[in-house]
Amino acid sequence: MTTERSDPTALALRLLARREYGRRELGDKLLRAGCDAGDVALALDALAAAGYQDDARYVEMLTRTRVRQGHGPLRLRQDLQRAGIEVGADPEIDWLQQAQAVCRKRFGNTPPADARDYARRARFLAGRGFTGETIRQVLGAGRERDFAAD
């Protein structure tokens, strides 16, 4: 009789019933659970062939989640690389609009009051994973030069 620990397919199905996983992430979980590496590879191939595990679907789910959480393209790319997914073309998302919404939610509609406020907002957006160009567009191109005289 095989237990769930020794049956990677059953364990993988239980994990996939809760949420999507990338192939490498799911394989790592199965290996940590004590499953044999050869059995894990076979189980992952079978699950992918049956349509239970799909990296493209995982990328879509992760993209939706990160956008909803207010993260930018750099953070999304980092999360995909961490999950072992080849980073292809950027999804069709208006990152400028996303960054504006995140900034507006955090700081309101007022522009940065001074250089210190500008830097604080820029750090916040950079920490969320937005590019420097997007940050400059959101905070107002040239505004950092206006504050240099302060």
Curated annotation (Swiss-Prot):
InterPro entries from the UniProt entry: RecX_HTH_1st, RecX_HTH_2nd, RecX_HTH_3rd, Regulatory_RecX, WH-like_DNA-bd_sf
Keywords tagged on the record: Cytoplasm
Any one annotated GO CC term: cytoplasm
Protein's UniProt keywords contain Cytoplasm: yes
Biological process annotations from GO: regulation of DNA repair
Domain of life: Bacteria
Gene3D superfamilies in UniProt: Winged helix-like DNA-binding domain superfamily/Winged helix DNA-binding domain (1.10.10.10)
The keyword rRNA-binding is annotated on this UniProt entry: no
Coiled-coil parts of chain: none
Subcellular location, record wording: Cytoplasm
Protein task: Modulates RecA activity.
Record-stated family: Belongs to the RecX family.
Family annotation (HAMAP family): RecX
Name of the protein this chain belongs to: Regulatory protein RecX
Organism annotation: Acidithiobacillus ferrooxidans (strain ATCC 23270 / DSM 14882 / CIP 104768 / NCIMB 8455) (Ferrobacillus ferrooxidans (strain ATCC 23270))
